[in-house]
């Protein structure tokens, strides 16, 4: 059973291990999980994941793997061996890539991390997709990739809260992980398709990723407690 009692995932979006651990030391693993992304992982190597696990946190390794099937599957296997709770891959890598990852995790005798597919990045709008040759609305592309992810046996999807209602209706078994969450009154920064924590949960999101409103707060522990209070009503 998970030690974390909320759907919150705090993004440790820092350039150094020291800065990330300074924030982690102010957070309660019972109130949030943590996300390790590309910058932090690259600057501190795999040891950051083990250190966070030792502190009691469940870790979402957000590296968005996207490569040929075997290479991606081996990367997912390595992440599982670190003890991560969740790992993600780009759905646009295709069905065979996602199936290879699923099959590799199925070989494990120990705990398996949640395998999550990335659909359309929350910073992208229709004009951004058009720029890479996709003349579709973000919502339509999300639904296309979601169907592919379900066929591959993925555990869930990263998606914006605006796509969550349609995804829950079409794919109720998939767990939805939503970035771009901003408590009421927060700046939007570079995330375009956003909702508040309560709105996102009501829309069908299962896990909420929150970064700067907590990580850049004067008192991160207090900021986290405020978000917990908001979602608990």
UniProtKB/Swiss-Prot annotation:
Task: Output this protein's name.
Answer: Orotidine 5'-phosphate decarboxylase
Self-association state and partner proteins as the record states = Homodimer.
Reaction(s) the record says it catalyses? orotidine 5'-phosphate + H(+) = UMP + CO2
Alphabetical GO CC annotations of the entry are: cytosol
Q: Which family does it belong to?
A: Belongs to the OMP decarboxylase family. Type 1 subfamily.
Q: What's the domain of life for this entry? A: Bacteria
User: Part of which pathway?
Assistant: Pyrimidine metabolism; UMP biosynthesis via de novo pathway; UMP from orotate: step 2/2
Name of the gene: pyrF
A GO biological-process term: 'de novo' pyrimidine nucleobase biosynthetic process
Q: Which CDD domains match?
A: OMP_decarboxylase_like
GO terms, molecular function: orotidine-5'-phosphate decarboxylase activity
The record lists substrate as bound by 13, 35, 62-71, 122, 182, 191, 211-212
What PANTHER family does the entry give? OROTIDINE 5'-PHOSPHATE DECARBOXYLASE (PTHR32119:SF2)
Q: What residues make up the catalytic site?
A: 64
């Amino acid at each position: 059973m998970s030690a974390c009692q909320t759907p919150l995932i705090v993004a440790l979006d820092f350039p150094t291990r020291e800065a990330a651990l300074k924030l982690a030391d102010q957070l309660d693993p019972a109130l949030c999980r943590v996300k390790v992304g590309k910058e932090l992982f690259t600057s501190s190597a795999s040891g950051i994941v083990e250190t966070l696990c030792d502190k009691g946190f469940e870790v979402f390794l957000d590296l968005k793997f996207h490569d040929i099937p075997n290479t991606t599957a081996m990367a997912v296997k390595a992440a599982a061996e670190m003890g991560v709770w969740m790992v993600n891959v780009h759905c646009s890598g295709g069905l065979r890539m996602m199936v290879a990852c699923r099959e590799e995790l199925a070989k494990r005798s120990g705990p398996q991390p949640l395998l999550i597919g990335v659909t359309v990045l929350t910073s992208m709008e229709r004009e951004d997709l058009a720029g890479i040759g996709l003349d579709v609305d973000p919502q339509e592309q999300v639904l296309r990739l979601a169907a592919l992810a379900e066929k591959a046996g993925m555990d869930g999807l990263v998606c914006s809260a605006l796509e969550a209602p349609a995804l829950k209706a079409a794919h109720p078994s998939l767990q939805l992980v939503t970035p771009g969450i901003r408590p009421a009154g927060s700046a939007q920064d570079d995330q375009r398709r956003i909702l508040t924590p309560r709105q996102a949960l009501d829309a069908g999101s299962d896990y909420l990723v929150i970064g700067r409103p907590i990580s850049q707060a004067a008192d991160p522990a207090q900021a986290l407690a405020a978000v917990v209070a908001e979602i608990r009503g």
